[in-house]
A protein has these predicted regions:
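Bacterial N-terminal signal peptides that target proteins for export
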Residues: 11, 17-37
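Generic alpha-helical structural signal
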Residues: 5-6, 18, 23, 47
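Bacterial N-terminal signal peptides
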Residues: 37-45
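A structural boundary/capping signal
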Residues: 5-7, 14, 49-247
Length: 247
């Protein structure tokens, strides 16, 4: 895994520890409805909460502070949200063409919705487990960077960031509130590399969707993951004490 996680190397104004990184077809009507739901879910997921009064504290503990807007990670995250807005235009184009376009983005829309619709045959943890496993199987391990969900699904290659972004979008499309889906960069203390995961709040606990395993694990159980920063529609926050967990 050496050399695969370079994306935080240019960060400034962050603690030194934050600078070490590795990190089918279906009916036309159903497609119209499914794509519309996905457009709303993904775009809104990067912009606003579903319920303003239903926001749990951050995973891995709540001792976080906002990063300065000039910090490189913040700039990258804001750029990613701009890319998601471009994805919305591609979704609309697919709707107008009844998904008959040869555009690769329409193929990505179809792939994403197939994963989400299959996951919706389950509930709760089983739904999230299906999303995690399906995206892990879809994306091949390769060096990656922060980009929108459609590009990730189109290329089908990427690292932990690519998996996490795709899972973020898929969880939102599956109906989870923007307040209940976040991305977290962590330091794997056991293997000594930095990593990114998607986390989803369900039934009072944060569940980790990780490209390194198909199993869902609670944040409180993953003692070898020391949190570094958390990203969501509100912005980017870092943990005051990155290595907050005590052996």
């Amino acid at each position: 895994m050496n050399g695969e996680y370079r994306w935080l190397s240019s960060l400034n104004n962050l603690p030194a520890c934050l600078q070490r990184t590795r990190c089918a077809d279906w009916g036309v009507l159903n497609m119209h409805v499914a794509i519309f739901v996905t457009v709303v879910a993904i775009v809104v997921g990067f912009a606003a909460p579903t319920c303003a009064n239903d926001r749990p504290s951050d995973p891995f503990g709540n001792d976080t502070i906002e990063l300065n807007k000039e910090t490189a990670l913040v700039e990258m995250w804001e750029s990613l949200r701009d890319q998601v807005l471009l994805d919305r235009a591609h979704f609309r184009s697919c709707i107008e063409s009844n998904n008959q376009s040869n555009d690769t983005d329409c193929a990505a829309v179809s792939t994403l919705m197939k994963i989400v619709e299959e996951a919706r045959q389950n509930q709760g943890k089983a739904l999230l487990g299906h999303l995690n496993r399906s995206i892990n199987l879809l994306i091949n391990a390769a060096p990656g960077y922060l980009t929108g969900p459609l590009e990730v699904i189109t290329v089908r290659n990427g690292d932990c960031k690519s998996h996490s972004i795709a899972k973020y979008g898929a969880a939102r499309a599956a109906g989870f509130s923007a307040d209940h889906v976040r991305l977290v960069t962590v330091h794997d203390r056991r293997h000594n590399f930095d990593h990114m995961v998607a986390v989803v709040f369900y039934n009072g606990e944060w569940l980790i969707l990780d490209n390194l395993t198909n199993l869902l694990v609670r944040d409180t159980e993953k003692r070898d993951y020391a949190p570094l920063a958390v990203l969501d529609y509100k912005g980017v926050r870092r943990y005051r004490s990155p290595y907050w967990m005590i052996d």
